[in-house]
């Protein structure tokens, strides 16, 4: 404690002990009387302070000092302080603002303290004279203490005036209970006198004596100015957490513990431990001067080396206990007595995070659960990062930090602390029949299912099934901090279809996450091998879906298929995962996978049919096939890409081949509840249902690609052995959501969709069907009304969105993508991959990879599936959720066994036009020139229904030939009903 009390007056007026005692008496008087009022900190005062600081710098530049360039380095600290003060003044340049700044209580106290510390340093050189050049002298030690104080002051001014703007009244204290104390006693004040602070603290945590109060002040008052700022209070509460026993912790760790060192630097720790180099296990600990609020522990290793470490995500006493048990921290400051700190280890209450119905439904829709960590997709969230609030599992956070990850894995926000949390799963029984329509990590419904009673009924069974699945998935009640940056926090979208989402985190999502159908978190280090998530592995393996010749028979991957990942490989990987690894969460009914809002009424019926009409095995198969097909759908990256593309759902109509208009893919059906698949498919001629199933299937591949960077990949795992029609039928809309699924490589006309559908079928066959023998129910096709790209974007969500408990901030520009975009937004997706691919491959982008490759996701590497770390928040408006949905749908079909599906939609003709369609944008010049009504009439004259013709034209971008080809391939209900009847 002597060290800590001496630290408050590093100047010490030389090394005279009498003067030190006198100063201690003066300090006691100041504590009783309170500090004097500060004069206004006008520009003149600030400039005077600058001159004093400059003088200190010149004195410290004397070569005789031989200052080491290690923290705290005064020759860096004072110039940085000067620059920040200049920045502050530049923000308050006019007279009115400057007057306001000069009267700011905190700023006045800060400038006064800075001036006094500078004068003390100058006086130190005057009085110390030659002793200043002796590295071991007391005067030199006092200069080092002053350097630490200047370092603390710099950190404080930057925290209170970030970017030069005063934010002291909005400063966020990391620990919630400590923040409540400050708000209760001091409101929005930034700084309070020590005397006032001590009295208020005494009301909550009794201070036994005046001596204890002085020792406490020397610990809290980092800037030694007789005031306690909100910044200093935050640091103190983080160092000696938890708040409930903070003074007891402080007494054990700072007052009585022999290993505590106040105002010690890195070099001084090494010098102090040098004498114990022959005694391994010797250790001391200090406040980190570079990371205020954290501890730095120096210790002697078994081979006599001296190391220093900063423990993460645990209180100091826990770190010391663990280190003692492991044989690292045995002798505090070389002493044989090591205090027993186990008494401080009291079970701390965990924050309980309640999963909302919307979140529950959204994650059920994705085939995942809210409590599942979105980084590893293996463990449940059990830690919350402060102050951003993102949630994850401890193992992922630890891995991230051990790999030198900086800040929050999702938003890169500074990690000031962590809190253990427990997720209270949503109990659908408490919410009536609405079990899981769609889960929005931010509590925002992905789709407005309540608007349509029919939709409600059709989704009822799906919700119930999803609830059970979600319950199974929920491995642990613990959840992690919620995001976005974030900035990452998702933003609500104006459309019910639109869903708020967070920007993708900088770290590429893991395949494991995709596999689990969970939003990928940006943690680089936590991202483990995709082995944990078979679906994710699939995504990586799966190339862009190649257009298979017939839906029933797995078509060979056409040239259109992206070369980077052979569909067969992807398929096989997916299949392998599906078979070998059951989905973490119970498979979701196709209904759940097909958002009602996104799908047309008929499409919804298709979804319902898939979920209800088709035997449970089929539904389960679809979800199981993916192993986490719903998870794939949940992939935020995929959804993002879709949002970016903002493909209109209508444009991405669902066809018998299973392809949906890009818009349809982007947005899950929100129409009336899907009727039985068999019924819907026939009524829609399987166009809607098949397309929906295809889109869902496509989404599955996309989610796998997401592993690369949560990039939806429409690469079908070409399951040649499996019929593709069911897959096509099942999630076409979802594929749209993935971006690639929307057109599955044929973002353009129906021909492209056809090829994509075959690919999807292949993927379903090979991957889904192989993994799950049960046929996959076909989701209903989405109605063209959904062609608005914004719908798709609204469905897209980022991993951060799901991870964050934070409510949606607002719509993103991407989320609100204009619904006016042509239904074939998939071209946007194809624009990334298609342009580089041959026409066939372009028409069939690596379902989701292409979309992700769109400029919005330039960072995605289609071939590798890896994506460079984007900024913590990428595109808030990215169609992440839509991608998820499509992936989910895609995976659902994949889960179903193609073999079980007795009948498949007619094989789609080769997509000879697919590449063109992909490259061609939905709003191409040809579409604009041709008379849409005449085209509709012409095709209707050939016996096709108006809705089918309209969807086909939207998908084909008003290209009659392509639309005719689409109708020919998908307009008539494929023989998928047997599969649905699994």
UniProtKB/Swiss-Prot annotation:
Places the protein is found: Cytoplasm
Result for mutant: residue 257 to L: In ADMIO3; likely pathogenic
InterPro entries cross-referenced by the UniProt entry: Adaptor_Cbl, Adaptor_Cbl_EF_hand-like, Adaptor_Cbl_N_dom_sf, Adaptor_Cbl_N_hlx, Adaptor_Cbl_SH2-like, CBL-B_RING-HC, Cbl_PTB, EF-hand-dom_pair
UniProt keyword terms in alphabetical order: Calcium, Cytoplasm, Disease variant, Metal-binding, Phosphoprotein, Repeat, Transferase, Ubl conjugation, Ubl conjugation pathway, Zinc, Zinc-finger
Binding residues for 4-O-phospho-L-tyrosine: 286
Effect of residue 373 to A: Abolishes E3 activity but does not affect binding to substrates
Statement: the UniProt record of this protein carries the keyword ATP-binding: no
Residue segments, region Linker: 344-372
Compositional bias (Basic residues): 906-922
Tissues expressing this chain: Expressed in placenta, heart, lung, kidney, spleen, ovary and testis, as well as fetal brain and liver and hematopoietic cell lines, but not in adult brain, liver, pancreas, salivary gland, or skeletal muscle. Present in lymphocytes (at protein level).
Subunit and interaction comment: Interacts with SH3 domain-containing proteins LCK, CRK and SORBS1. Interacts with LCP2 and ZAP70. Interacts with CBL. Interacts with SH3 domain-containing proteins VAV1, FYN, FGR, PLCG1, GRB2, CRKL, PIK3R1 and SH3KBP1/CIN85. Identified in heterotrimeric complexes with SH3KBP1/CIN85, CD2AP and ARHGEF7, where one CBLB peptide binds two copies of the other protein. Interacts with poly-ubiquitinated proteins. Dimerization is required for the binding of poly-ubiquitin, but not for the binding of mono-ubiquitin. Interacts with EGFR (phosphorylated). Interacts with IFT20.
The protein, known as: E3 ubiquitin-protein ligase CBL-B
Species annotation: Homo sapiens (Human)
């Amino acid at each position: 404690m002597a060290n800590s009390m001496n630290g408050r007056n590093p100047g010490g007026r030389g090394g005279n002990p009498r003067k030190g005692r006198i100063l201690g008496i003066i300090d006691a008087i100041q504590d009783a009387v309170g500090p004097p009022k500060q004069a206004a900190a006008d520009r003149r005062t600030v400039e005077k302070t600058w001159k004093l600081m400059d003088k200190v710098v010149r004195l410290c530049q004397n070569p005789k000092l031989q200052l080491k360039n290690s923290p705290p380095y005064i020759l860096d600290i004072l110039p940085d302080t000067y620059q920040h003060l200049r920045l502050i003044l530049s923000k308050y340049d006019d007279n009115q603002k400057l007057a306001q700044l000069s009267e700011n209580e905190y700023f006045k106290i800060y400038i006064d303290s800075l001036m006094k510390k500078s004068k003390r340093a100058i006086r130190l050189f005057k009085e110390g004279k030659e002793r200043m050049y002796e590295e071991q002298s007391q005067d030199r030690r006092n200069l080092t203490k002053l350097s630490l104080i200047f370092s603390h002051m710099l950190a404080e001014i930057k925290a209170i005036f970030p970017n030069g703007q005063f934010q002291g009244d909005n400063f966020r204290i990391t620990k919630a209970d400590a923040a409540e104390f400050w708000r209760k006693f001091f409101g929005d004040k930034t700084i309070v006198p020590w005397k006032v602070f001590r009295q208020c603290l005494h009301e909550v945590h009794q201070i036994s004596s005046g001596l204890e109060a002085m020792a406490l002040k020397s610990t809290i008052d980092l800037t030694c100015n007789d005031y306690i700022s909100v910044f200093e209070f935050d640091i103190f509460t983080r160092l000696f957490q938890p708040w409930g026993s903070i003074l007891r912790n402080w007494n054990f760790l700072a007052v009585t513990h022999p290993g505590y060192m106040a105002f010690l630097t890195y070099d001084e720790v090494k010098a102090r431990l040098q004498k114990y180099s022959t005694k391994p296990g010797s250790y001391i600990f200090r406040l980190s001067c570079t990371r205020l609020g954290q501890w730095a522990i120096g210790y002697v290793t078994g081979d006599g080396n001296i190391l220093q470490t900063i423990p993460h995500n645990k209180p100091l006493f826990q770190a010391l206990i663990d280190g003692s048990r492991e044989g690292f921290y045995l002798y505090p400051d070389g002493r044989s007595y090591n205090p027993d700190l186990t008494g401080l280890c009291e079970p701390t209450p965990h924050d309980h995070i309640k999963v909302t119905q919307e979140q529950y439904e959204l994650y059920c829709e994705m085939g995942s659960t809210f409590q599942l960590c979105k980084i590893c997709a293996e463990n449940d969230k059990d830690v919350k990062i402060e102050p951003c609030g993102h949630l994850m599992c401890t193992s992922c956070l630890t891995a991230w930090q051990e790999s030198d990850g900086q800040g929050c894995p999702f938003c890169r926000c500074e990690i000031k602390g962590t809190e253990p949390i427990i997720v209270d799963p949503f109990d659908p029984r408490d919410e009536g029949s609405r079990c899981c329509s769609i889960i929005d990590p931010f509590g925002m419904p992905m789709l407005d299912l309540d608007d349509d009673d029919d939709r409600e009924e059709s989704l009822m069974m799906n919700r119930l099934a999803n609830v059970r699945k979600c319950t199974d998935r929920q491995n642990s009640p613990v959840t992690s901090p919620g995001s976005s940056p974030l900035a990452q926090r998702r933003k609500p979208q104006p459309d019910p279809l639109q869903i708020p989402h967070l920007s993708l985190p900088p770290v590429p999502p893991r395949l494991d996450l995709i596999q689990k159908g969970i939003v990928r978190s940006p943690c680089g280090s936590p991202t483990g091998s995709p082995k944990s998530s078979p679906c994710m592995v699939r995504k990586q393996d799966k190339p862009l879906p190649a257009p298979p010749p017939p839906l029933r028979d797995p078509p060979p991957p056409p040239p259109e298929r992206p070369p980077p990942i052979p569909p067969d490989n992807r398929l096989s990987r997916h299949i392998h995962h599906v078979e070998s690894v059951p989905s973490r969460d119970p498979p979701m009914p196709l209904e759940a996978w097909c958002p009602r809002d996104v799908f047309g009424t008929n499409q919804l019926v298709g979804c319902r049919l898939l979920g209800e009409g088709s035997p449970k095995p089929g539904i389960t198969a679809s979800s199981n096939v993916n192993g986490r097909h719903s998870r794939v759908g949940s992939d935020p990256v995929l959804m993002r890409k879709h949002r970016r593309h903002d493909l209109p759902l209508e444009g991405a109509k669902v066809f018998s081949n299973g392809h949906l208009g890009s818009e349809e893919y982007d947005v899950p059906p929100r129409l009336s509840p899907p009727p039985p698949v068999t019924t819907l498919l026939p009524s829609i001629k399987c166009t809607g249902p098949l397309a929906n199933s295809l889109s869902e299937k496509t989404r599955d591949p996309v989610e796998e690609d997401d592993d690369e960077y949560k990039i939806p990949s429409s690469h079908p795992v070409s399951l040649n052995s499996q019929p593709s029609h069911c897959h096509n039928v099942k999630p076409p809309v979802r594929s749209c959501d993935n971006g690639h699924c929307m057109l599955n490589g044929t973002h353009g006309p129906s021909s492209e969709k056809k090829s994509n559908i075959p690919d999807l079928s292949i993927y379903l066959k090979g991957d889904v069907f192989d993994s799950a023998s049960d046929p996959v129910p076909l989701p209903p096709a989405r109605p063209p009304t959904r062609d608005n790209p914004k719908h798709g974007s609204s469905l897209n969500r980022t991993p951060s969105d799901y991870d964050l408990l934070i409510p949606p901030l607002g719509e993103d520009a991407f989320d609100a993508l204009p619904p006016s975009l042509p239904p074939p937004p998939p071209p946007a997706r194809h624009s990334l991959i298609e342009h580089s691919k041959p026409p066939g491959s372009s028409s069939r982008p690596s379902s989701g990879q292409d979309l992700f490759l769109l400029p919005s996701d330039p960072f995605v590497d289609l071939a590798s599936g890896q994506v460079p770390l984007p900024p913590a928040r990428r595109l808030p408006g990215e169609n992440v959720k839509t991608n998820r949905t499509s992936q989910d749908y895609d995976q659902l079909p994949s889960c179903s066994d193609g073999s079980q599906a007795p009948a498949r939609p007619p094989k789609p003709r080769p997509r000879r036009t697919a590449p063109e369609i992909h490259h061609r944008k939905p709003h191409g010049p040809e579409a604009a020139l041709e008379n849409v009504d005449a085209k509709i009439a012409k095709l209707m004259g050939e016996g096709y229904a108006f809705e089918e013709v309209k969807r086909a034209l939207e998908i084909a971008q008003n290209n009659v030939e392509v639309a005719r080809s689409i109708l020919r391939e998908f307009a008539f209900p494929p023989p998928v009903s047997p599969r649905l009847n699994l």
